[in-house]
């Protein structure tokens, strides 16, 4: 006759076997995938997208030629095979650029804003507050200079009535290189070809090419 202790031992053993059969399934459900580092959160939907493409274990281990030590061998990402993942990745990357602001002290500040709430200011150059008149003159540099005649545009030295303070008409100077016939061997010259340096010297000459309306900063500092 079976005693009560033996029945109790058999019952405990059966319960232990049942519990062990359900434990692997519960652990498998709770276990997170080992590719969490490749998950990118969509900031608009707060959902995670996995951008790592896995090959099936059977596809890798089934063919002897494709046997590799890593069953999760990844292939190059092809945009045509998964256009939805590619578009989501581009959106997430744009969100990261939009939200991360690099400050002057090299720190990163995260900011959020609504899409489409971007104001673009008009960056057009404003018209000058006045117009300046100029006078064309022909400057003669002498018969030993090449070129000999240069056209200049000189401003009127007096305050023009169309340009009122704090603005003033000012000449815009441009330096040109001219050739002058060498008079002495000790004359200083800019760099010129060897076939010219024995008879000619190169000099920089300023030329007034325009008359522009600009702010008179000298008048401003004198008033302060």
Swiss-Prot record:
Range of residues in the leader sequence: 1-29
Keywords carried by this UniProt record: Cleavage on pair of basic residues, Disulfide bond, Glycoprotein, Hormone, Neuropeptide, Signal
Disulfide bonds: 132-169, 155-211, 163-213
GO biological process: neuropeptide signaling pathway
GO molecular function: hormone activity
Tissue specificity remark: PTTH is synthesized by two dorsolateral neurosecretory cells of the Bombyx brain.
Membrane-spanning parts: none
Residues that carry a glycan: 156
Function: PTTH is a brain secretory polypeptide of insects which stimulates the prothoracic glands to produce and release ecdysone, the steroid essential to insect development.
Quaternary structure (record): Homodimer; disulfide-linked.
Full protein name: Prothoracicotropic hormone
Source organism (scientific name): Bombyx mori (Silk moth)
């Amino acid at each position: 006759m079976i005693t009560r202790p033996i029945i109790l031992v058999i019952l405990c053993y059966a319960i232990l076997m049942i519990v062990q059969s359900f434990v692997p399934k519960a652990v498998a459900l709770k276990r997170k995938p080992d590719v969490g580092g490749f998950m990118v959160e969509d900031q608009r939907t707060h959902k995670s997208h996995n951008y790592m493409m896995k090959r099936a274990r059977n596809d890798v281990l089934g063919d002897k030629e494709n046997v590799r030590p890593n069953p999760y061998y990844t292939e190059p990402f092809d945009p045509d095979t998964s256009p939805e993942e590619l578009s989501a990745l581009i959106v997430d990357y744009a969100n990261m650029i939009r939200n991360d602001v690099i400050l002057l002290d090299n720190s990163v500040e995260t900011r959020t804003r609504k899409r489409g709430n971007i104001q673009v200011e008009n960056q057009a150059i404003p018209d000058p507050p006045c117009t300046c008149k100029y006078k064309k003159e022909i400057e003669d540099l002498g018969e030993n200079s090449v070129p000999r005649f240069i056209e200049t545009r000189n401003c009127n030295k007096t305050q023009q009535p169309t340009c009122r303070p704090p603005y003033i008409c000012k000449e815009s100077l441009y330096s040109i290189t001219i050739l002058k016939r060498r008079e002495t061997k000790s004359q200083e010259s800019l760099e010129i070809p060897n076939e010219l340096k024995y008879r000619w010297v190169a000099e920089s000459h300023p030329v007034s090419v325009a008359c522009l309306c600009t702010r008179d900063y000298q008048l401003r500092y004198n008033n302060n």
